[in-house]
């Protein structure tokens, strides 16, 4: 179990990268490391982190996610990748179509397994685990290992596992200031939101809403109020999602 901010991504990437370098294969082949994530954004983030850590090495890293045209995954089909970071849905599609070879996978890593369970991906993950049954190692990472669902899931996938718990640091939390605002009604809430977003120190802000339809409505309202914004929601093409994240990152 490793809560957000404990460095779990580097904790599993560094050992597998070192393993690939210590035991190189004689010729190119299917991926040796398979990392599953619940969302496209996390898959891209993990892959970018892996590329940074693997800079100046011969290791190849690719992603397989939904929202991307079939032809853009040609690099994975070429059987010249060491690490593949994927979301379950698109990967399972390629496995069923026999476009992805699982037989060389040595290590299967499940990042944010609790979220994948919450999103209903348990059956897909077990199917993928069955396709990689020749693997030597399985790693499961979760914000918490409490609850019967995640425990039962871990027992089905892991064989005699070693449990490691990372304690989150409280040092960084002290830098976070939190406020709670009570609005009288929807109109008041919108005016309050616009007021807060127009403050000088609101340089980069993320606003969460409950429904996808509300995302579009709120984005338009803010634009009409002169507040520059972009939105992200699940039905967007991946190129649009990536563009939105880049705009937020660049400010």
Regions found by a protein language model. Give the residues of each.
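Conserved helicase RecA-like core
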Residues: 1-251
């Amino acid at each position: 179990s490793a809560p957000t901010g404990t460095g779990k991504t580097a904790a599993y990437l560094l050992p597998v990268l070192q393993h690939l370098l210590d035991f190189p294969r004689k010729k190119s082949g299917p991926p040796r490391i398979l990392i599953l994530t619940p969302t496209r954004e996390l898959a891209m983030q993990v892959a970018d982190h892996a590329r940074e850590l693997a800079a100046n090495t011969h290791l190849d890293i690719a992603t397989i996610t939904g929202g991307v045209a079939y032809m853009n995954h040609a690099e994975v089909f070429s059987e010249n990748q060491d690490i593949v970071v994927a979301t379950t849905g698109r990967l399972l599609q390629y496995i069923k179509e026999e476009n992805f070879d699982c037989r060389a996978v040595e290590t299967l890593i499940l990042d944010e397994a609790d979220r994948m369970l919450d999103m209903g991906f348990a059956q897909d993950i077990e199917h993928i685990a069955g396709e990689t049954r020749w693997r030597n190692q399985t790693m499961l990472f979760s914000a918490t290992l409490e609850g019967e669902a995640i425990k039962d899931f871990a027992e089905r996938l892991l064989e005699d596992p070693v449990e490691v718990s990372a304690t989150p640091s409280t040092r960084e939390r002290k830098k976070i200031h939190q406020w709670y605002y009570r609005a009288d009604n929807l109109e008041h809430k919108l005016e309050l939101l616009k007021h807060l977003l127009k403050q000088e120190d609101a340089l980069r802000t993320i606003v969460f809403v409950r429904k996808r339809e509300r995302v579009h409505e709120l984005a338009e309202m803010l634009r009409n109020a002169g507040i520059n914004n972009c939105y992200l929601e699940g039905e967007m093409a991946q190129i649009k999602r990536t563009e939105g994240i880049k705009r937020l990152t660049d400010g």
